[in-house]
A protein has these predicted regions:
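Alpha-helical transmembrane segments in inner-membrane proteins
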Residues: 1-345
Length: 345
């Protein structure tokens, strides 16, 4: 217990440090003292003098909301990836395997093609979120036989349906005008640029409500890792728990994808690294994954802003640059050790 608390406390302090550094560092460097004063002034309890008034919109309306979006999205993606890996007993899958990313992409491109994105900033998130849930439901239904969800069938169904949906998305893309194409591509690459407080609060409520539910199922996930027969003997309703967990994963990932675009590898590499550090006990791993995922995406967003400053790289490109080499290393390691992916957890 002490180790877990200390490790999570370390992650929390690290996250606060990254947030503060991200607020003052960028194309325009804002003194740390001014950053703190701006935040305190916004509480309405203080009225400190800021050295430059131009710092206020930069810190509070440009950087702060996108950073907070990175916190909830990174945390949610890592939490869902960790849960999915434990549920399927496979360390190289994440929540995207159940079709959420492909469904969200289809919803986004439909919204853009219909010209609806100019009416509200929430149109694309709503369309992408709705289609993500629909495609996830279809994949879950296909992979369920006689009331039982087969892990391998779920993965294969996810790959097949995602490929089909991706083909439909590509067909629609060919009919888009150049400006519409750019709008979709920028979203699809995964970007936090232009995220406002509205986006943060749009995602905050479901993340705050649903994440603790997954934390609660840590014990049940540990039991499921022992095998279905053992789980049944211990009184676990496998169908009910698995269904609830998959629904929560679909909702959390859909919310994350629809407000940030397709950001890859967060849900894959963060839980895997943590397993090496603190073990596979989901009761502590799930909470640590949320905090570590928030740290990872917030830091990646900082890199996306400063690597080619004043130009900006999509944060999805940064996570891919970091995550892809590690993923390749992981596959090579598993291959050398001769392990079977569905048996190694």
């Amino acid at each position: 217990m002490k180790y877990r608390i200390n490790f999570n406390l370390f992650l929390f302090i690290l996250l606060i440090g990254i947030i503060i550094f991200s607020l003052f560092y960028g194309a325009v460097r804002v003194p740390v003292s001014d950053v703190i004063k701006i935040i305190l002034n916004k509480t309405g309890l203080f009225n400190y003098e800021i050295s430059k008034q131009s710092y206020i919109p930069i810190v509070f309306f440009v950087r702060f909301p996108r950073i907070m979006v990175a916190v909830i999205v990174g945390g949610a993606l890592a939490l869902c990836g960790c849960t999915m890996q434990s549920l399927l007993k496979n360390p190289i899958v994440d929540s995207g395997i159940i079709g959420i990313s492909s469904g969200a992409s289809l919803g986004a491109v439909i919204a853009v093609s219909l010209g609806l994105t100019v009416t509200s900033i929430f149109i694309m998130p709503l369309f992408s979120g709705a289609f993500a849930l629909i495609i996830s439901a279809i994949i879950y239904k296909i992979s369920t036989l006689r009331g039982r969800t087969d892990n391998l069938l779920l993965i294969l169904s996810g790959i097949a349906i995602s490929s089909f949906v991706g083909a439909i998305t590509s067909v629609i893309l060919t009919s888009l005008a150049e400006t519409e194409m750019k709008e979709y591509i920028f979203w699809a690459m995964g970007s936090l640029n232009g995220r406002r407080w509205e986006h943060f609060f749009f995602g905050l409520i479901p993340v705050v409500i649903l994440s603790p539910i997954l934390f609660y199922y840590g014990k049940e996930l540990n039991i499921l890792l022992l095998g279905e027969e053992e789980a049944k003997s211990l009184g676990i309703n496998i169908k009910k728990i698995r269904g609830k967990i998959l629904i929560i994963i679909a909702l959390l990932t859909a919310i994350s994808v629809c407000i940030s675009g397709n950001i890859t590898f967060v849900g894959l590499i963060v839980p895997h690294i943590l397993r090496k550090l603190i073990g596979s006990d989901n009761r502590k791993l799930l909470k640590s994954s949320f905090l570590a995922g928030a740290c990872f995406l917030t830091f990646s967003d900082l890199l996306s802003r400063i690597v080619l400053a004043p130009k900006e790289i999509s944060v999805g490109i940064i996570t891919a640059f970091i995550g892809a080499p590690y993923f390749i290393y992981l596959i090579i390691k598993i291959r050398k050790e001769g392990k079977i992916l569905w048996k190694i957890l």
